[in-house]
Amino acid sequence: MLIIFLFFNFCYGFNEPLNVVSHLNHDWFLFGDSRSDCNHINNLKIKNYGYLDIHPSLCNNGKISSSAGDSIFKSYHFTRFYNYTGEGDQIIFYEGVNFSPHHRFKCFFNGSNDVWIFNKVRFYRALYSNMALFRYLTFVDILYNFSFSIKANICNSNILSLNNPIFISTNYSKDVYFTLSGCSLYLVPLCLFKSNFSQYYYNMDTGFAYGYSNFVSSDLDCTYISLKSGSYKIFSTGFVLSIPTKALCFNKSKQFVPVQVVDSRWNNLRASDTSLSDACQLPYCYFRNSSGNYVGKYDINHGDNGFTSILSGLLYNVSCISYYGSFLYDNFTSIWPRFSFGNCPTSAYIKLNCFYDPLPIILQGILLFLALLFIVFLLFLVYHG
């Protein structure tokens, strides 16, 4: 029995990395959209769990923050808002598709959606890298020393209306300050229109300035700055002040744990982008994707088998999570678990050549049988003189 076990273990491998998102224990959390929004099922004409890419048994575990039609990026910048909030040691993201080239958003008629896709990459890169160091995520409003009775109505379309940042004239008579308080770290937007000017956030406590210059953008070009609690003054060399109104709040620092990101894309009939894979980089992020087109069972954009398989890893714990995938066991494997965390395999074996062409084996058996018959015939002749 031991020989049979070793044969199959070495020849077939019982501990290959799985293309799933998973967790080491029950201390995990998922941020998503309609494909993991269990509450949205009740709004369908027929209550059909085939709409989801997650298993229905995950719906009531309190470890999912998802909203149909939303994304963290969309909620961050626009009036269409869902307060994504959650906490866990191992964080999984499966959202982002609800702001894509399919929506063709741009601030002006002659603006550029490409600029907004670049903004999306920068945003998620900052989100993923920060979330590898913190347990808790939510949205907060940014407080100011006065109310904005006069503001420019800029950057609206028939799809979305921008409200983070907003804009006021630099001729406004008062200095503009904002205060960040209560979170360990904030992700704040700093956005500029095409022009030869710059803008800064100046920390009144430390004297440190966070700046951004804009020379080439054909739309609203944004960078995303991680700020600590404090009082900040905004000043600009342009004609308008870009005023942030919302920030992502990171709290409860943790030991570094890479986030896991599942690609969020449409069926090929709609335009998607590669923002999430561009943003999800080592060492702070593992990216999981399906090899095929997204083809849903409920409709073409909901209930794909490939992504359902990737999300099925949330149903069980694994021993190790790495760049190559998740490992069920911590014994050994044929693929070394690079950039890993958890109880990971400590050795990689060489897979033996256990598969043969059956035809040569059959011929060898026939020849061996004939050789045995010949030997028996010779022994018979010798025995009988």
Swiss-Prot record:
Disulphide bridges: 38-59, 107-155, 183-249, 191-222, 280-285, 320-344
Show the stretches that span the lipid bilayer. Answer: 362-382
SUPFAM superfamilies under this entry?
SGNH hydrolase, Viral protein domain
Q: Which molecular-function annotations from GO does this UniProt entry contain? A: host cell surface receptor binding; sialate 4-O-acetylesterase activity; sialate 9-O-acetylesterase activity; sialate O-acetylesterase activity
Signal peptide positions on this chain? 1-11
The EC designation for this entry is 3.1.1.53
Which GO terms of type biological process are on file? fusion of virus membrane with host plasma membrane
Any miscellaneous information on file? Answer: Isolate N5 belongs to genotype C. Genotype C probably arose from recombination between genotypes A and B.
What name is this protein filed under?
Hemagglutinin-esterase
Record gene name: HE
